């Protein structure tokens, strides 16, 4: 289901000079004991970004997942990029979240960085985020203009591919524009806010239970704290 999205994302990363770097040992790939699901992850070093991770879960007709988060360099205060796509094939159910994830919620920051996402929100009403996500506070590390959908095969086949391509293009554009302007948040504060994002997300990540059910608690705990949100590890 999501292989074309994965290819588009990683082709774009490589076109921007992205270099694949090593995932923590034992976390780059896993297969469930029953052999019915596999998970594979990639970590990219991309100019302008300190960390860009990608994960693909394939559990056949039961579940397909594509997840990615991009962390800009600390001297850039623009939003993180968050992608979370889930397809439950047996139920023909799509859950999609595409967002520029803000470090802060003040008006000046949002005015500087969110014109592109606002345009996408208007262009793709099927993914306009009116249904609030249940696991997260939409006022912290999520924007009011996120593309969010609980839909079916029509959204998965028609709306999502176009929205995904437009979303990636808009985020690259945001990054290029932000790189030309001085940041309003200091590098030290960007680091603190990105680390707080990891802690916040690790505490609330709805996928952790999903990964645990497929790959066991020990592996999934490592995956959560060492790969998905490494700043959440205890000091």
Curated annotation (Swiss-Prot):
This is 15,16-dihydrobiliverdin:ferredoxin oxidoreductase. The gene is pebA. Belongs to the HY2 family. The keyword Oxidoreductase applies. Keywords: Oxidoreductase. Gene3D superfamilies: 3.40.1500.20. Pfam families: Fe_bilin_red. One of its GO terms (molecular function) is 15,16-dihydrobiliverdin:ferredoxin oxidoreductase activity. Its EC number is 1.3.7.2. It catalyses: 15,16-dihydrobiliverdin + oxidized 2[4Fe-4S]-[ferredoxin] = biliverdin IXalpha + reduced 2[4Fe-4S]-[ferredoxin] + 2 H(+). Catalyzes the two-electron reduction of biliverdin IX-alpha at the C15 methine bridge. It is an enzyme of class 1 (oxidoreductase). One of its GO terms (biological process) is phytochromobilin biosynthetic process. The keyword Oxidoreductase applies.
């Amino acid at each position: 289901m999501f292989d074309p999205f994965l290819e588009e994302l990683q082709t774009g990363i490589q076109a921007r000079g992205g270099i694949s770097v090593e995932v923590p040992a034992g976390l780059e790939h896993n297969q469930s004991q029953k052999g019915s699901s596999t998970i594979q992850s990639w970590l990219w070093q991309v100019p302008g970004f300190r960390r860009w991770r990608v994960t693909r879960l394939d559990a056949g007709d039961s579940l397909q997942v594509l997840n990615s988060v991009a962390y800009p360099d600390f001297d850039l205060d623009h939003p993180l990029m968050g992608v979370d796509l889930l397809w439950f094939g047996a139920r023909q159910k799509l859950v999609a979240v595409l967002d520029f994830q803000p470090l802060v919620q003040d008006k000046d920051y949002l005015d500087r960085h969110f014109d592109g996402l606002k345009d996408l929100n208007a262009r793709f009403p099927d993914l306009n985020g009116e249904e609030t996500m249940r696991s997260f506070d939409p006022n912290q590390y999520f924007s009011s203009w996120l593309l969010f959908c609980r839909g079916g095969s029509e959204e998965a086949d028609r709306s999502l591919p176009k929205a995904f391509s437009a979303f990636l293009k808009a985020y690259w554009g945001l990054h290029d524009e932000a790189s030309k302007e001085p940041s309003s948040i200091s590098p030290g504060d960007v680091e603190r806010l990105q680390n707080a994002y990891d802690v916040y997300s690790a505490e609330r990540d709805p996928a952790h239970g999903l990964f645990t059910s497929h790959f066991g608690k020990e592996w999934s705990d490592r995956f959560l704290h060492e790969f998905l949100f490494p700043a959440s590890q205890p000091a």
